[in-house]
Structure formats: structure tokens, C-alpha cells
Amino acid sequence: MVRNWCSLIRPRRIEIDESTHTRFYGEFVCQPLERGFGITLGNALRRVLLSSIQGAAIVSVKIDNVLHEFSTVPGVKEDITDIILNLKGVRLKLLSDGPRVIRIDTKKEGVITAADIITDGTVEVLNEDHYIASLSGDMPFRMEMVVNSGRGYVQAKKEKDVDQPEGTINIDALYSPIKKVNYTVTHARVGQIADYDKLSLEVWTDGNVLPEDAVAFAAKILKKQLQVFVGLHTVIGTEEVEEEEEGEAVSEKENLNDILLRHVEDLELSVRSANCLKNAGINLIGELVQKSEAEMLKTKNFGRKSLSEIKEILAEYGLTFGMKLEFTPWNKDVREEMGEIQEEG
């Protein structure tokens, strides 16, 4: 049984659009992918991002002299249901384990915003200009809120906990720090083949988590969930395992040969690094990996930045500089086969 995933092309790196990247937005481009994998990965990442990234939210509130959500507060423009609705829009970052208590204690006339929230230093308010309520007079207004961490959307508890003080109102919690996720799939080219996928993923957050961290967390969640399926091959018989291991060894060797025979342009290096390799006469990946780092640094215009770039990309293929190879994929016969050298007339 041959391990059929060996020959699938894998994306080399993730590109981030630095011109539009902020704490709240990021666009990530992943290529090349096998045809169909753009939608497969894009949809999976989108669903996990929207449902499973941990955030913080207000889960309950207690307002002085208020016993239930249908009450009103003298001197406050909004009724309690409106205040609760506004509290759901307060975006918070929990800097330690929850739950934590935050509060508002004011008697100034005018607008109350999230900036008026008093914390103990373990909770950060992300949208301080968010509107909560308005006071029409110099009336004292005191409110305590409990903040906790969680995932997704959780409905308010219908029954109060025994340790909750009288007048506590549980509210629905929108924990997710992800506001929106879009993805598009277009064609990508590798060498002369343009039948691959390019996945572009856009992520909007509330600032609780950086977009790139959110994508990384989503990928780790998917990896953990899929890990159990990887072990399914252990249930087959001993004889099949031996055959599979032998097949895997052959497959891995063939796969390595394929990589070494590919042109260095397939690595999609920066223009500077690509020109350095071209000027040094390094055309195939097999030629590149046999060079030592010291040799590469002696190449004209080739610096440590280019070295780091190439090392990172080679590592994704399980390759490195200074490899000792049992064959020479850069000989004349192979180059003729690859179209590198034209036959002499």
C-alpha cells in the first residue's frame, strides 16, 4: 500500500498583505494547492474561525435597585433591556483566567460609554467609544458585570447560580473575537502548470486576537481534530504494515527525486535571491541543496537575508543546505530530459 499523499503538492508559505494588515484585519494568500483544496481548506478554516476561537464577553450584570430585565432606572434614558443589548456589544480582552468583575460607578449627566468601565487590570476594553446608556441628571448609576472567556455564542443561563446575588441578570454571550471571514479561490501557476489553487483568506477581528494568530489557532484546532484519523493505519494486519512501510520508503525516495529535479524557480524566491542563483549557475533544487551555507554566502550579492529565505523554504520540503546525495540529478542526461540542454544538431 503506497502512501498516496506523498505526491500531493503542498503550499510553500503564507503571504500576508502588509499594505492592508492591521490589528483588526488581515489578508492571507496560500499557494499552490492541489485543485479542490482551496475550497476544502478555505471552508474548514472559515467555519473554525467563526465558531471555535476563544474570546471574552460579559455574561451577567447587576444594576443597583434593579431586580429584573423589565425594570427601569430613574434618570436613565434606556430601559434595562436596551442597556443589556448595548452591553453585548462591549468587546473585551481577558488577560488572566476568568471570571472577572468589572463595574461602572458614575453620577455625571450625559453619555456612558465603555470607556467608563472600571477594571482591575486583568480586563482590557477594546472599544471604549461603544455606547451603553445616557443619564439625564446627576443620579448615581452603579453596575457590576461579570466577564468570562469562552467560544462562539452561548445563550444566557435561565437559572441563576446559588452564589449569584439577588438582582443578577444573566445575558447572552458572544465570545467569538472573529467578526467576519471571507475566502476566494483562484488559479495558481507552478512552472508551466496553471491548474493549481490559490486560496485568499480575509479575517476581521475585534482586536482581541491578531488575524494571523486567529488563523494559526484555527489550523491547530483542525490539526488536533484530524490527528485521530491519521492513526487508522495501525489497525491493519502486520503483513500489510510491512508492505506499507516498504512502499512508503520507495515512495518517499521517488518523491525526493521529484523535488530535487525541479527548477529553483518553483521555490518562488524573491527576485534578488532568484537572480543570485541564476548568476551562480544553480538551476535545479538538487544543485542548491548540495551547496553549503558558507559556499552560498560567497556567491555575489547573496547575503544572509537570502540565505534565511531559502533555508526556510527548503525546510518545508524537508531539505537543507550541505546535503550529501547518493545521486547527481544535475548531470547532462537529466538536464536533457528536463529540457535544460537542447540536443546538438
Curated annotation (Swiss-Prot):
Nucleotidyltransferase among keywords: yes
Molecular function GO terms recorded: DNA binding; DNA-directed RNA polymerase activity; protein dimerization activity
CDD domains: RNAP_alpha_NTD
Family matches, as Pfam families: RNA_pol_A_bac, RNA_pol_A_CTD, RNA_pol_L
Region of interest (Alpha C-terminal domain (alpha-CTD)), residue spans: 256-345
Gene Ontology CC terms, in alphabetical order: cytoplasm; DNA-directed RNA polymerase complex
UniProt keyword list: DNA-directed RNA polymerase, Nucleotidyltransferase, Transcription, Transferase
Enzyme Commission number(s) of this protein: 2.7.7.6
Biological processes annotated in GO: DNA-templated transcription
Gene3D superfamilies: 5' to 3' exonuclease, C-terminal subdomain, DNA-directed RNA polymerase, insert domain, RNA polymerase, RBP11-like subunit
Catalytic activity line of the entry: RNA(n) + a ribonucleoside 5'-triphosphate = RNA(n+1) + diphosphate
Subunit structure: Homodimer. The RNAP catalytic core consists of 2 alpha, 1 beta, 1 beta' and 1 omega subunit. When a sigma factor is associated with the core the holoenzyme is formed, which can initiate transcription.
Biological function: DNA-dependent RNA polymerase catalyzes the transcription of DNA into RNA using the four ribonucleoside triphosphates as substrates.
Domain notes: The N-terminal domain is essential for RNAP assembly and basal transcription, whereas the C-terminal domain is involved in interaction with transcriptional regulators and with upstream promoter elements.
Name of the protein: DNA-directed RNA polymerase subunit alpha
